[in-house]
């Protein structure tokens, strides 16, 4: 959520920023919220004037009674004042709800360093690590490798649940579990994050706090009859751990790493990368979440991105980092990096992590603040998160980049201690 004061003071600037994002944004929302804000402030002034008049008349009643004079006229006037105040209170509540409705639908303001552009083709490559894997034999896609090795069962996943669900079997399941533990160990032991195991269902307030609702409700799995949502990422429960709280500045930055299953309807992605493990309705992920002081947030974003990169370096998987352009930035981020791993079957890099600084956008929605040294006026915190990284896509990348001509797959050395020193899947 943006600062309403900034919109009030610079409505035309905000309109231009929204148009430059490349999204289909209705600038009338800005005009409407400015008008509602003006009406809100008018109501507050009028209510204060009415209350002042009522207090003045209330003090006169005592004097009139002492003097034995008639108070009926002034009592009637006070009743009218009270009725008018109640009417304004009702209108104020209505105006506040309308303001909230609009504010929840206005996207974040991009950082000045976000490049111009409309699609992912306009994203800017920042750096690469490793070289794309080359083979001297005809390589296979991970869905064929997994099926041939009998470690991934797409057919039975479809029978059990439907398209874009997968059953991991035998060494496939063990590989997934090994990756989860490797990622968590690196982030907690080497990078200093505190591990969190969060609920996989959250309420509407939590989904609203991190920005999934109301805009992306069609992409969420909702549990009917009780208002719960299956989490699309551990970002949601971990960020909302601190909803409506005031943190101590001495405790910042707070760094959490959370493994969870993730659930996404992906309503707008029909036909996109739907084979294999790249785009599933249910998948596992280790998420990194930070709560930091505003002046530290962009340094912390660089550190978070490096932390996510480290797990790919440890696995020897070639990747690149791109800075996301305005049109591809999404609703909540002020600046975002994507980490893309090399996938031979696609002959291109594929997103495996997004690392974002939301500045105070989520904190305003979730009302997360801090006090410097635990004292003074509370200020909104900055929140950051990033995938550290997606597990299923890591499995896919390992199967494709570490495949051998005989159909086996070499297990990356870093994972072998988690797989009882097994070195090959065959």
Curated annotation (Swiss-Prot):
Family: Belongs to the class-II aminoacyl-tRNA synthetase family. Type-1 seryl-tRNA synthetase subfamily.
Biological role: Catalyzes the attachment of serine to tRNA(Ser). Is also able to aminoacylate tRNA(Sec) with serine, to form the misacylated tRNA L-seryl-tRNA(Sec), which will be further converted into selenocysteinyl-tRNA(Sec).
Domain notes: Consists of two distinct domains, a catalytic core and a N-terminal extension that is involved in tRNA binding.
Location(s) in or outside the cell: Cytoplasm
GO molecular function: ATP binding; catalytic activity, acting on a protein; serine-tRNA ligase activity; transferase activity
Organism expressing this protein natively: Clostridium novyi (strain NT)
Protein's name in the database: Serine--tRNA ligase
Chief location: cytoplasm
Pathway the protein takes part in: Aminoacyl-tRNA biosynthesis; selenocysteinyl-tRNA(Sec) biosynthesis; L-seryl-tRNA(Sec) from L-serine and tRNA(Sec): step 1/1
Alphabetic keyword roster: Aminoacyl-tRNA synthetase, ATP-binding, Cytoplasm, Ligase, Nucleotide-binding, Protein biosynthesis
Quaternary structure and interacting proteins, as annotated: Homodimer. The tRNA molecule binds across the dimer.
């Amino acid at each position: 959520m943006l600062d309403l004061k900034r919109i009030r003071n610079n409505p035309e600037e905000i309109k231009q920023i929204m148009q430059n994002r490349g999204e289909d944004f209705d600038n009338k929302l800005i005009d409407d919220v400015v008008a509602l804000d003006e009406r809100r402030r008018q109501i507050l002034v009028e209510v204060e004037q009415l209350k002042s008049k009522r207090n003045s008349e209330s003090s006169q009643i005592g004097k009139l009674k002492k003097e034995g004079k008639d108070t009926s006229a002034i009592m009637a006037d006070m009743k009218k004042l009270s009725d008018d105040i109640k009417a304004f209170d009702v209108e104020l509540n209505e105006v506040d709800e309308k303001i909230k409705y609009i504010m929840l639908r206005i996207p974040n303001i991009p950082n000045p360093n976000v490049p111009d552009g409309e699609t992912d083709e306009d994203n800017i490559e920042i750096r690469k690590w490793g070289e794309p894997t080359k083979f001297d034999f005809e390589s296979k896609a991970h869905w064929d490798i997994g099926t041939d090795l009998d470690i991934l069962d797409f057919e039975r996943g479809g029978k059990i649940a439907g398209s874009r669900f997968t059953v991991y079997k035998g060494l496939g399941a063990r590989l997934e579990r090994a990756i989860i533990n490797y990622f968590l160990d690196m982030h907690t032991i080497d990078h200093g994050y505190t591990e969190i195991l969060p609920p996989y269902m959250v309420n509407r307030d939590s989904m609203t706090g991190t920005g999934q609702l109301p805009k992306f409700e069609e992409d969420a799995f909702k549990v009917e009859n009780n208002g719960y949502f299956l989490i699309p990422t551990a970002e949601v429960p971990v960020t909302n751990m601190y909803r409506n709280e005031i943190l101590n500045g001495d405790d910042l930055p707070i760094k959490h790493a959370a493994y969870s299953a993730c659930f996404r309807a992906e309503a707008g992605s029909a036909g996109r990368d739907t084979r294999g493990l790249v785009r599933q309705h249910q998948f596992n992920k280790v998420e990194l979440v930070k709560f930091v002081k505003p002046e530290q947030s962009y340094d912390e974003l660089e550190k978070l991105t490096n932390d996510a990169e480290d797990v790919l370096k440890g696995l020897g998987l070639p990747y690149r980092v791109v800075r996301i352009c305005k049109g591809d930035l999404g609703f909540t981020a002020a600046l975002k990096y994507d980490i893309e791993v090399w996938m031979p079957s696609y002959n291109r890099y594929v997103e495996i992590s997004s690392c974002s600084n939301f500045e105070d956008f989520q904190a305003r929605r979730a009302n997360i603040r801090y006090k410097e040294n635990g004292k003074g006026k509370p200020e909104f915190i900055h929140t950051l998160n990033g995938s550290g990284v997606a597990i299923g896509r890591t499995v896919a990348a390992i199967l494709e980049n570490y495949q051998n001509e005989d159909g086996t797959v070499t297990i990356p050395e870093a994972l072998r201690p988690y797989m009882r020193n097994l070195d090959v899947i065959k």
